[in-house]
Curated annotation (Swiss-Prot):
One GO process term, biological-process aspect: regulation of pH
Primary location recorded for the protein, binned into one broad class: membrane
A UniProt-annotated Pfam family: Na_H_antiport_1
Higher taxonomy: Bacteria, Bacillati, Actinomycetota, Actinomycetes, Micrococcales
Record protein name field: Na(+)/H(+) antiporter NhaA
Subcellular location: Cell membrane
InterPro entries in the cross-refs: Na/H_antiporter_dom_sf (IPR023171), NhaA (IPR004670)
Membrane-spanning residues: 31-51, 74-94, 112-132, 143-163, 173-193, 196-216, 222-242, 285-305, 315-335, 350-370, 384-404
Organism field: Renibacterium salmoninarum (strain ATCC 33209 / DSM 20767 / JCM 11484 / NBRC 15589 / NCIMB 2235)
Length: 436
């Protein structure tokens, strides 16, 4: 008797503990996304009101000092992008390391699809932007990376607003894709957008980073030691000319994920402890404040809005975020699924993947950061890029809403199925099923 091997499935459910962890993360990010949306709206209203001068005066107000010749006299807007976003990337780094060491990304068969989707979602938008601006000059081409990012908090806020009951597997895919996307984004920032590179400061940063690594590997949790080391690392990376948010990722990668016995099944390590402490600070404070100072752009009414959208920078960003993200993510997912002879998990359709791919076109936080790095905070191209990012994110959200709402009744059935515990063991029955 010949037994056929069970077909590989894309978007399979996680284990139940992983399902609970992902659900908790998404809940916090959804709240953060709502605050992010509120901060963005407040910034746009203030920046286009009769009192707009006070907004820009606040954003550009300098605070800090310059000890030992260090350049720490920064504007509030710069503190938000260089300092607060380092917390955001610290959380992204913790999540990425956990996924690769103790999560789904440690298994090639589960990792290949979200990684390929993230790469496709970065490469295709970058290509589209570059093709549109091929003859526009080097300055404009420098913005090629702006449409490569996905804002998970904003995307989850959209899901909350439209009240979709998206299956856990799809939400997990979106989160994992965004985590990989963040790694690619920070790599792009570090490699392609340094400013007056000073290698000696990078070398000096290795000292506090090494001490921080030693301390966390010893499972030391004392903030009297860890926080000063983290701040010194941040300062030295900032002085090096590499964007200071890179320090957040480097510090995160130093933190151990699993316990000393290195068995992922024995529970979380120090990384999850830090994540629990800092995720609310990142999602609820750091990112909304950054959005408040970064999203405020004086549009200049309808005439100013249409003028912004005639800039090839804006055209490239809008096309790349709306079309490029959808084509790149959907295309890569479809290609990997078909070439590995896998199939979508039961109850899912390719229209679900398309909806998620379009939703990933919401590229807000990191896109705004890269725009400032590419063009400079005071450049007209940066203002046009902000308008384009906001416009493209809104259009992507509306298109995704249409597609996902069509499937919402079906999602309700899947969500109900994921809550049935007929055997009363405390674990919904669908999570008891094994998928080899």
């Amino acid at each position: 008797m010949i037994t056929s091997r069970t077909a590989r499935r894309t978007f399979r459910r996680n284990s139940y503990p992983e399902h609970l962890r992902i659900t908790a993360i998404l809940r916090k990010e959804t709240v953060g996304g709502a605050l992010l949306l509120a901060a963005t709206i407040a910034a746009l209203i203030w920046a286009n009101s009769p009192g707009s001068e006070s907004y820009f005066a606040l954003r550009d107000a300098k605070i800090g000092f310059n000890p030992f010749g260090l350049k720490l006299d920064l504007s509030l807007g710069a503190w938000a992008s260089d300092g607060l976003l380092a917390i955001f990337f610290f959380i992204a780094g913790l999540e990425l390391k956990r996924e690769f060491i103790a999560g789904d990304l440690r298994r090639f068969d589960r990792a290949i699809v979200p990684i390929a989707a993230a790469i496709g979602g970065v490469a295709v938008p970058a290509i589209i932007y570059t093709l549109i601006n091929l003859s526009s000059g080097a300055e404009i081409l420098n913005g090629w990376a702006i449409p490569t990012a996905t804002d998970i908090a904003f995307a989850l806020a959209v899901l909350a607003v439209i009240s979709t009951h998206l299956p856990t597997a799809l939400r997990t895919f979106l989160l994992t894709l965004a985590v990989v996307d963040d790694l690619i984004a920070i790599s792009i920032i570090a490699v392609f957008y340094p400013h007056n590179l000073q290698p000696q400061y990078l070398a000096l940063a290795l000292i506090p980073l090494g001490l921080f690594t030693w301390a966390v590997q010893k499972r030391i949790r004392s903030w009297y030691l860890l926080l000063p080391l983290a701040i010194i690392t941040w300062v030295l990376v900032h002085e090096s000319g590499v964007h200071a948010t890179v320090a957040g990722v480097l510090l995160a990668f130093a933190v151990p994920v699993v316990r000393r016995d290195r068995n992922p099944d024995n529970g979380p390590g120090l990384a999850e402890h830090f994540e629990h402490r800092f995720r609310p600070l990142s999602a609820g404070v750091a990112v909304p404040i950054f959005a408040f100072f970064s999203a405020g752009v004086a549009i200049g009414g309808w005439a100013g809005f249409t003028n912004s959208l005639t800039d090839t920078v804006a055209i490239g960003i809008i096309a790349a975020l709306i079309l490029g993200k959808a084509i790149g993510i959907f295309g890569a997912t479809f290609l990997i699924t078909k070439t590995t002879r896998a199939s979508l998990d039961d109850g899912l359709s390719w229209i679900d993947v398309l909806g998620l791919a379009i939703l990933a076109g919401i590229g807000f936080t990191v896109s705004l950061l890269i725009s400032e790095l590419a063009f400079g905070a005071d450049s007209p191209h940066n203002d046009h890029a902000k308008v384009a990012i906001l416009t493209a994110s809104l259009v992507a959200a509306l298109l995704a809403t249409v597609i996902l709402r069509i499937r919402n009744q079906h999602y309700r059935k899947l969500e109900k199925l994921e809550s049935v515990d007929a055997d009363g063991d405390g674990v919904p029955d669908v999570f008891d099923e094994k998928d080899d």
